[in-house]
Curated annotation (Swiss-Prot):
One of its GO terms (molecular function) is DNA binding. This is Movement protein BC1. Keywords: DNA-binding, Host cell membrane, Host endoplasmic reticulum, Host membrane, Host microsome, Membrane, Phosphoprotein, Transport, Viral movement protein. InterPro entries: Gemini_BL. GO terms for biological process: transport of virus in host, cell to cell. It holds the Pfam family Gemini_BL1. Binds to dimeric supercoiled plasmid DNA. The modification Phosphothreonine is found at T221. The modification Phosphoserine is found at S223, S250. GO terms for cellular component: host cell endoplasmic reticulum membrane; host cell plasma membrane; membrane. Phosphorylated in yeast. It is found in: Host cell membrane; Host microsome membrane; Host endoplasmic reticulum membrane. Belongs to the begomovirus movement protein BC1 family.
Length: 293
């Protein structure tokens, strides 16, 4: 980021709002932007055109004491999105910093709908009283129309710092990321051919996901190539009992090491009786008398 990268726009090409004073607020408060007149919008609508913001400049000019502290947060929202997803870009800068904020849109909107962009500000961690007219905001918009929407190269938001006592280390800004997309396969009558190499095309009764490696597939006994490429692709169709390899080698080894002798109660009694009798006989034998010579 460079505070000198962005040059002031040519006012002749921009729609300018009034430079109005705004009261300090800890809650998001709207900054009024000047959009094309109703007649201009109607003309574009009759020509079946859509519109986008090429460039938006928000000028902030502070009017607070020299010892004022706090941060100003400015946000651009797209009201076509749900409330928790409408934020598109935001800036944070010191309350005493005169600054120009630059935003470049990345989407078109239909003139049949209300203009979706809203601009808000709020002040955080400040020692200035609420409802004090702490600054003036002015917006400049450059819009364009097109017969139909096209992909717009992304241009990041930036700033132009006007107060010499502040630098790029004192400000911050961000932009929303691209929305994530996950393809959801369509189930259809024919789901047999998968992973086919060739142009992106489908046959009657097929979906594109069914013809790619992402879609689920039925067995294709006629395709030896698929069997070679994906030899285990249909194992999920087997029952869990067939896929269960059984107990591990360590468990089997422990079981083999354990004694596996079974005896009836009569056999156990006979074994004990015999062992006791042997002990008695061995301990009660009379010792032979030694002969005297």
């Amino acid at each position: 980021m460079d505070s000198q990268l962005v040059n002031p726009p040519n006012a002749f090409n921009y729609i300018e709002s009034h430079r109005d004073e705004y009261q300090l607020s800890h809650d998001l408060t709207e900054i009024i932007l000047q959009f094309p007149s109703t007649a201009a919008q109607l003309t574009a609508r009759l020509s079946r055109s859509c519109m986008k913001i090429d460039h938006c400049v928000i000028e902030y000019r502070q009017q607070v004491p020299i010892n004022a502290t706090g941060s100003v947060i400015v946000e651009i929202h797209d009201k076509r999105m749900t409330d928790n997803e409408s934020l598109q870009a935001s800036w944070t800068f010191p309350i005493r910093c005169n600054i120009d904020l630059h935003y470049f849109s990345a989407s078109f909107f239909s003139l049949k709908d209300p203009i979706p962009w809203k601009l808000y500000y709020k002040v955080c961690d400040t020692n200035v009283h609420q409802r004090t007219h702490f600054a003036k905001f002015k917006g400049k918009l450059k819009l364009s129309t097109a017969k139909h929407s096209v992909d717009i190269p992304f241009r990041a938001p930036t700033v132009r710092i006007l107060s010499k006592q502040f630098s790029e280390k004192d400000v911050d800004f961000s932009h929303v990321d691209y929305g994530k997309w996950e393809r959801k396969p369509i189930r259809c009558a024919s789901m047999s051919r998968i992973g086919l190499r060739g142009p992106i095309e489908i046959r009657p009764g097929e979906s594109w996901a069914s013809r790619s490696t992402i879609g689920t597939a039925q067995p294709d006994t006629d395709s030896e190539m698929e069997n070679e490429l994906h030899p285990y692709r249909h194992l999920n169709r087997l029952g869990t009992s067939l896929l269960d390899p059984g107990e591990s080698a360590s468990i089997v080894g422990d079981q083999r090491a354990e004694p596996n002798i079974t005896m009836s109660m009569g056999q156990l009694n006979e074994l004990v009786r015999t062992a006791v009798q042997e002990c008695v006989n061995s301990n009660c034998q009379a010792s032979q008398a030694k002969s005297l010579k």
